Amino acid sequence: VLSPADKTNVKAAWAKVGNHAADFGAEALERMFMSFPSTKTYFSHFDLGHNSTQVKGHGKKVADALTKAVGHLDTLPDALSDLSDLHAHKLRVDPVNFKLLSHCLLVTLAAHLPGDFTPSVHASLDKFLASVSTVLTSKYR
C-alpha cells in the first residue's frame, strides 16, 4: 500500500519524467529485451532493433498506462481494469515479465533523473510499480 509520502514521491517523480515518458518507456523495453531475452517472445512480430518504431510505440503505451496509474493512485484496480483483462486473457503475458519491466523502468529513471532518484523516491517508485504489477496480474486467477 502506498503511503501519503509514497504518493507524493511518485507524483513528483512522474512530473519530472514529463514529456520524456514515451522515450523512457521505449528505453525500458529495450533494456528488458537486452537483459531478459525471453521477454522477446511476446513481441516476435516486432522489429526489436534499437530505435524501432514498434518498440517506441509500445513504450508510449506503457508510459501512457503509467501516467494514468499515477493519476489514479487510490483507484488503481478500476483505472487499469481493461489492461489487466488484456494482459491476462488475450495476451497471456507471464506475470514475471511485469517485474522485469518494472526493474528496467527503475534503471531507466535512475539513469535519466539521477539527482531526483533518492533512496526514498526509489522505494516509492518500486512500491508503485509493484502495485501496478499486482493489478495487472490480478485477473490471472
Curated annotation (Swiss-Prot):
Heme b binds at residue 87. The keyword Hydrolase does not apply. Keywords: Acetylation, Heme, Iron, Metal-binding, Oxygen transport, Phosphoprotein, Transport. O2 binds at residue 58. One of its GO terms (molecular function) is heme binding. One of its GO terms (cellular component) is blood microparticle. PANTHER family: HEMOGLOBIN FAMILY MEMBER, HEMOGLOBIN SUBUNIT ALPHA. Belongs to the globin family. This is Hemoglobin subunit alpha.
